Design a protein with these regions (language model features):
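Short, charged N-terminal helix-start/capping segments
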Residues: 3-4, 8-16, 21-26, 30-35, ...
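Internal, Lys/Arg-enriched amphipathic helical interaction segments that engage polyanionic partners
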Residues: 188-267
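Amphipathic, oligomerization/interface secondary-structure segments
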Residues: 247-475
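A broad, low-specificity signal marking well-ordered, structured residues that form hydrophobic/aromatic
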Residues: 177-179, 225, 304
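Long, contiguous, compositionally biased segments that the model treats as domain-scale units
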Residues: 1-211
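Phosphate-binding glycine-rich loops and adjacent basic patches that engage nucleotide phosphates
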Residues: 148-164, 226-234, 242-249, 261-272, ...
């Protein structure tokens, strides 16, 4: 993005020259306004903040679109905006230039895809100890296809024979994910897919940020290729997306903790749908391997939030469904609150005293408040932690024993782990001072991170054995 891109565009029905470098877009009008005119027009005005997509043409004749920009005035008609993403059309010499609209499919490349969909699958045999056993099936490579909400997600491998001075390089192979849309998509739709797919690969790699090396959208258009008006041919037009990535150390290439598509046991669609929900939390994932080796209060609180969120989705009404007496008491309280609300509402309808009505309305409001609280109470954090540590013991026990050994602890009960986590969470949440992390708090933190994955994968209908394989690979 550090390269300079210049060109022309129209914004608010006005022609501008643009200068784009270092993620900053500057619009220069054909004629600069005088200082007095600009000062009087903008004096005391609060500029409206709106985010738009602005299209133009580069000085090399390519289509360009600056995505989700909000302009501010710099004076004399000059505008400036930060650009979080932009799109370059890969075709010129076409009139008019094709725009990034009515998109039919996207294709994505990246290291996370190479790890997830192993490109060496194009080798039919990997018994390299026997001469002549390595055969390449490059001519009949099959893709793995999945239908998600009527869109076809296709995993495949691209290969080519590179023109390289290195005579030892025979094939260049890259895995890709292609999504064929049932309905044509616009730029904002594509961005939504981009964010969801990144979220899925964050889950797969247990990393907060994931990069793609290439993100291309494409569509097919009809072109008249010569002077004969009937000579119409179809041409595929590509649009490459470029995104501003966070300034964080991303070390996915060094990570050995990842899983393959085959590990999901044909549950890709279910997992994708669940982990790309808006309510699915990924903020607690580590930034890198080094970030994964320490814990702080912020991480601790995010793990607590993610755990409770996943637990409530995986096991709704946990205590009510497992404790008959608790369920009876809860229903009795809710029935009483409902009865009192109805009683007060009826009294409001029959009463003419405005002061009395206001008082009754406040009482009804408080009843509604307590009703909401009682409905949401279904087991404490400590109870939920103990339940998960017991439920997923076969999966987490090896990790638990390793942590106990590392911290020179002979034995520790689930109740002690749960209480330590709960107490630390409460101190942080209520703004109370906290000491350095104890060994027990760190162990409970590490085990709960695994439990979150277990809850999610169980929601995706994976069996315990499949969950165990995935957990061992990620953690």
């Amino acid at each position: 993005m550090k390269n300079l891109i210049c060109g022309d565009l129209i914004y608010n029905e006005k022609k501008y020259k643009f200068d784009f470098r270092d993620n900053v877009l500057v619009l220069l009008p054909e004629d600069l306004e005088s200082y007095p005119k600009w000062q009087f027009e903008h004096l005391g005005k609060k500029e409206k903040k709106e985010y738009i997509n602005v299209e133009g043409t580069t000085n090399l004749g390519y289509y360009i679109c600056f995505v989700h920009v909000s302009f501010s005035n710099m004076g004399r008609g000059i505008m400036q905006a930060f650009v979080p993403a932009y799109i370059i059309g890969k075709s010129n010499l076409i009139c008019p230039l094709p725009k990034c609209e009515n998109i039919e499919k996207i294709r994505i490349y990246g290291e996370c895809l190479d790890k997830f969909y192993y490109p060496k699958r194009i080798i039919e045999s990997n018994d390299f100890f026997k001469e002549g056993t390595a055969k390449f099936k490059v001519k009949n490579i099959k893709t793995d296809d999945y239908i998600i909400k009527n869109d076809k997600f296709r995993y495949g491998v691209n290969w080519n024979i590179p023109i390289s001075s290195n005579i030892n390089v025979v094939l260049d192979v890259k895995s890709y994910l292609e999504v064929d849309f049932k309905d044509l998509k616009g730029i904002d739709d594509i961005l939504e897919y981009y964010l969801k797919i990144k979220k899925f690969f964050s889950f797969i790699n247990n990393r907060k940020y994931i990069e793609f090396s290439k993100f291309v959208a494409s569509k097919e258009i009809k072109l008249n290729c010569d002077i004969n008006p009937e000579n119409i041919k179809s041409k595929n037009i590509d649009f490459e997306f470029f995104f501003v990535e966070p300034d964080e150390k991303i070390d996915l290439s060094k990570s050995i903790n990842y899983i393959h598509l085959e590990d999901l046991n044909n549950k890709f669609s279910e997992i994708y749908n669940i982990v790309t929900e808006n309510s699915f939390l990924t903020e607690y994932y580590p930034l890198s391997g080094s970030d994964n080796r320490y814990v702080d209060n912020d991480k601790f609180l995010k793990v607590a939030s993610a755990f409770e969120s996943e637990f409530d989705k995986a096991i709704p009404n946990y205590k009510s469904s497992n404790n008959v007496e608790y369920d009876i008491v809860k229903k009795t309280i809710l029935d009483y609150i409902l009865l009192e609300k109805q009683k007060n509402n009826n009294e409001i309808l029959l009463n003419n005293d405005s002061k009395k009505i206001k008082s009754l309305e406040k009482i009804v409001k408080e009843y509604s408040y307590f009703e909401k609280i009682i409905k949401n109470i279904d087991g404490t954090l400590q109870e939920k932690i103990i339940f998960c540590l017991k439920k997923y013991n076969d999966i987490i026990d090896s990790k638990k024993q390793l942590l106990i050994k590392n911290y020179n602890i002979e034995k520790i009960k689930n109740g002690i782990l749960a209480e330590a986590f709960k107490n630390r969470r409460n101190k942080i949440s209520h703004g109370n001072p906290t000491d350095s992390f104890t060994d027990v708090e760190v162990i409970s933190y590490e085990l709960l991170r695994i439990c979150i994955y277990c809850l999610t994968l169980e929601r995706c209908n994976l069996n315990i054995e499949d969950i165990k394989i995935i957990i061992e690979k990620i953690f």
